[in-house]
Amino acid sequence: MSRVCDITGQTKSFGNKVSHSNRKTKRTYLVNLHNVTLFSDVLNRKFRFKISSRTLRTIDYKGGLDLYLLETSSRKLSDKAQKIKKMIKKATAENAKVSL
Protein backbone atom coordinates (compact mmCIF):
# COMPACT_ATOMS: atom_id res chain seq x y z
CA MET A 1 0.00 0.00 0.00
CA SER A 2 1.74 3.13 -1.19
CA ARG A 3 1.47 6.37 0.71
CA VAL A 4 0.95 8.73 -2.24
CA CYS A 5 -1.69 11.43 -2.65
CA ASP A 6 -3.99 10.54 -5.60
CA ILE A 7 -4.38 14.17 -6.72
CA THR A 8 -1.02 15.86 -6.17
CA GLY A 9 1.26 12.83 -6.16
CA GLN A 10 2.80 13.98 -2.88
CA THR A 11 4.97 11.27 -1.28
CA LYS A 12 7.06 10.93 1.84
CA SER A 13 9.88 13.41 2.34
CA PHE A 14 13.20 13.11 4.11
CA GLY A 15 14.93 15.21 6.72
CA ASN A 16 16.82 15.15 9.98
CA LYS A 17 15.77 14.65 13.57
CA VAL A 18 17.79 17.19 15.55
CA SER A 19 18.51 16.50 19.22
CA HIS A 20 19.09 19.05 21.96
CA SER A 21 22.84 18.67 21.45
CA ASN A 22 22.31 19.37 17.71
CA ARG A 23 23.07 15.79 16.58
CA LYS A 24 21.28 14.97 13.36
CA THR A 25 19.84 11.57 12.46
CA LYS A 26 18.00 10.77 9.24
CA ARG A 27 14.23 10.36 9.32
CA THR A 28 11.23 10.30 6.99
CA TYR A 29 8.07 12.39 7.07
CA LEU A 30 5.01 10.44 5.94
CA VAL A 31 2.07 12.05 4.17
CA ASN A 32 -1.13 12.40 6.24
CA LEU A 33 -3.53 10.56 3.90
CA HIS A 34 -7.31 10.21 4.15
CA ASN A 35 -9.76 8.15 2.12
CA VAL A 36 -12.43 10.58 0.91
CA THR A 37 -15.23 10.72 -1.62
CA LEU A 38 -15.47 14.02 -3.49
CA PHE A 39 -18.42 15.10 -5.62
CA SER A 40 -18.04 16.78 -9.00
CA ASP A 41 -20.86 19.26 -9.66
CA VAL A 42 -20.12 19.50 -13.38
CA LEU A 43 -20.01 15.74 -13.97
CA ASN A 44 -22.68 14.99 -11.33
CA ARG A 45 -20.55 12.10 -10.13
CA LYS A 46 -18.60 10.97 -7.05
CA PHE A 47 -14.88 10.14 -7.07
CA ARG A 48 -12.97 8.19 -4.42
CA PHE A 49 -9.49 9.44 -3.56
CA LYS A 50 -6.73 8.84 -1.07
CA ILE A 51 -5.52 12.42 -0.55
CA SER A 52 -3.38 14.36 1.89
CA SER A 53 -4.85 16.72 4.48
CA ARG A 54 -3.15 19.64 2.78
CA THR A 55 -4.84 18.85 -0.54
CA LEU A 56 -8.22 18.42 1.15
CA ARG A 57 -7.91 21.84 2.81
CA THR A 58 -6.95 23.40 -0.53
CA ILE A 59 -9.95 21.81 -2.29
CA ASP A 60 -12.27 23.23 0.39
CA TYR A 61 -10.61 26.64 0.06
CA LYS A 62 -10.96 26.72 -3.74
CA GLY A 63 -14.65 25.82 -3.55
CA GLY A 64 -14.81 22.17 -4.55
CA LEU A 65 -13.14 19.54 -6.69
CA ASP A 66 -14.11 21.08 -10.04
CA LEU A 67 -12.73 24.54 -9.31
CA TYR A 68 -9.58 23.14 -7.71
CA LEU A 69 -8.74 20.99 -10.73
CA LEU A 70 -9.51 23.74 -13.24
CA GLU A 71 -7.39 26.34 -11.41
CA THR A 72 -4.42 24.03 -10.72
CA SER A 73 -1.66 23.57 -13.29
CA SER A 74 -1.69 20.15 -14.96
CA ARG A 75 1.97 19.54 -14.13
CA LYS A 76 1.12 19.69 -10.41
CA LEU A 77 -1.58 17.01 -10.78
CA SER A 78 -1.29 13.23 -10.95
CA ASP A 79 -2.39 11.27 -14.03
CA LYS A 80 -5.70 10.34 -12.41
CA ALA A 81 -6.46 13.97 -11.57
CA GLN A 82 -5.48 15.12 -15.08
CA LYS A 83 -7.98 12.67 -16.60
CA ILE A 84 -10.76 14.00 -14.38
CA LYS A 85 -9.75 17.58 -15.23
CA LYS A 86 -10.00 16.75 -18.94
CA MET A 87 -13.49 15.26 -18.39
CA ILE A 88 -14.59 18.42 -16.55
CA LYS A 89 -13.28 20.70 -19.31
CA LYS A 90 -15.08 18.62 -21.94
CA ALA A 91 -18.36 18.69 -19.98
CA THR A 92 -18.19 22.47 -19.45
CA ALA A 93 -17.52 23.00 -23.17
CA GLU A 94 -20.53 20.85 -24.08
CA ASN A 95 -22.73 22.74 -21.60
CA ALA A 96 -21.59 26.04 -23.11
CA LYS A 97 -22.55 24.85 -26.62
CA VAL A 98 -25.98 23.69 -25.42
CA SER A 99 -26.74 27.00 -23.70
CA LEU A 100 -25.98 29.00 -26.87
Curated annotation (Swiss-Prot):
GO molecular function: structural constituent of ribosome
SUPFAM superfamilies hit by this protein: L28p-like
Superkingdom of origin organism: Bacteria
Pfam families per the UniProt record, alphabetical: Ribosomal_L28 (PF00830)
GO cellular component, one term: ribonucleoprotein complex
Sequence similarity: Belongs to the bacterial ribosomal protein bL28 family.
Descriptive protein name: Large ribosomal subunit protein bL28
Gene: rpmB
